[in-house]
Amino acid sequence: MSKEKCSLTGGKEKRGELVRSLAWQHLVKQEEEEAVKKEEKEEGEDEEEEGSDSSSDDPNPEPPCMHPDLLELVVDREKCRKIRRQYRQLIYTVQQNREDIVNTASDTLSEALEEANVLFDGVSRTREAALDAQFLVLASDLGKEKAKQLNTDMNFFNPIAFCDLLLLFVGFNWVEEECKEFSDCDDSIVLSFWGMLHEEATSWMLQAETFHFIFGSFKAERSARKPRLGCHKRACKMEGSGDMPTKLRRLDVHANQETTEKEVERILGLLQTYFQKYPDTPVSYFEFVIDPNSFSRTVENIFYVSFIIRDGFARIRLDQDRLPILEPTNVSQVDDESDSYSYCRKQGVISLSLQDWKNIVSTFEISEAMIKNSY
């Protein structure tokens, strides 16, 4: 009765674990499908916006004369959209065939990885790289599950069986000799066993030759190294002339922080001066941060302006042409730190390549930087 009860409880526990694992797999698969649908929806909205911008009332519109750099950007955007679509399709296909990939010995996972490697050659932006990382996480999980199901079928070493085979090999049988251990046997039988084993083993082993010293053994004591006179003369010469190398000082992190704060305050003063001079006119974000003569200085300006936006001294939004602009904020809202809902904050990432910087300078016709160098 107790055995039946234990078997019933064990079966219930196994069924419970199976139900929990299936529920967890269903939730994970549902979350992945929702993420893919959300990304496809955002992609469709982007395509609809571009389609509405390109449409016009003229039934036979003439092709607009676009700048070659802008035309290259449009082609690059279409290429990136195609890569994202292929990544999503690849992820969806692997998720649908998850059980077949794990339970069978097919090369579907390897083919999917090769396809992802081909797609990764055309990746140049963050969104495509994020999809590639998502696929790699999925592929690594599938590879881990396949590795767990491997069956090596290795034969473990059995010492008892080995002893029986060894005794049969040398021609010794326990049944014929009527003894169970070597202590019960005669000394002649034991010596003959080890003698035959020795003869067989020596034929499979190579003996290393002895080492003969040609000039005798090495000396135990190491000879003292003679000092080099050249280094001593050079050191005396440096001490006499007084030209000593500069010592490396410890890096001061606070000094770098103070430099950053001073630069942010200087750029904030320039921005506030512009707002006081033109209170009703927002300033273009690109015209404010872009330095037409230095790409590195442009990146530094974007970095410093981000602190101004974070602290609430200015805000950034899109105008009618979907271009970013800078506007002043209400000072009373910034000073009131107790009210956390006084203004809404959003966080974003700006990616700017060297080619994008050149295109912005030529498109906006920026000839002079609004933020002058302080050095």
Curated annotation (Swiss-Prot):
Instruction: Alphabetically list the UniProt keywords.
Output: Chromosome, Coiled coil, Cytoplasm, DNA damage, DNA recombination, DNA repair, Nucleus, Repressor, Telomere, Transcription, Transcription regulation
Q: Which domain of life is it from?
A: Eukaryota
Q: Mainly localized where?
A: nucleus
Recorded GO CC terms: chromosome, telomeric region; cytoplasm; nucleolus; nucleoplasm; Smc5-Smc6 complex
GO BP, one annotated term: DNA repair
Compositional bias ranges of the Acidic residues kind: 42-60
Taken from the record, one Pfam family name reads Nse4_C
Question: Residues annotated as region Disordered?
Answer: 30-68
Where along the sequence do coiled-coil regions lie?
23-51
Its subcellular locations are:
Nucleus; Cytoplasm; Chromosome, Telomere
Q: Which family does it belong to?
A: Belongs to the NSE4 family.
This chain's function reads: Tissue-specific component of the SMC5-SMC6 complex, a complex involved in repair of DNA double-strand breaks by homologous recombination. The complex may promote sister chromatid homologous recombination by recruiting the SMC1-SMC3 cohesin complex to double-strand breaks. The complex is required for telomere maintenance via recombination and mediates sumoylation of shelterin complex (telosome) components.
Please describe the quaternary structure of this protein: Component of the SMC5-SMC6 complex which consists at least of SMC5, SMC6, NSMCE2, NSMCE1, NSMCE4A or EID3 and NSMCE3; EID3 seems to be a testis-specific subunit. NSMCE1, NSMCE4A or EID3 and NSMCE3 probably form a subcomplex that bridges the head domains of the SMC5:SMC6 heterodimer. Homodimer, and heterodimer with EID2. Interacts with the C-terminal region of CREBBP.
The name this protein carries in UniProt is EP300-interacting inhibitor of differentiation 3
Give the classification, highest ranks: Eukaryota, Metazoa, Chordata, Craniata, Vertebrata
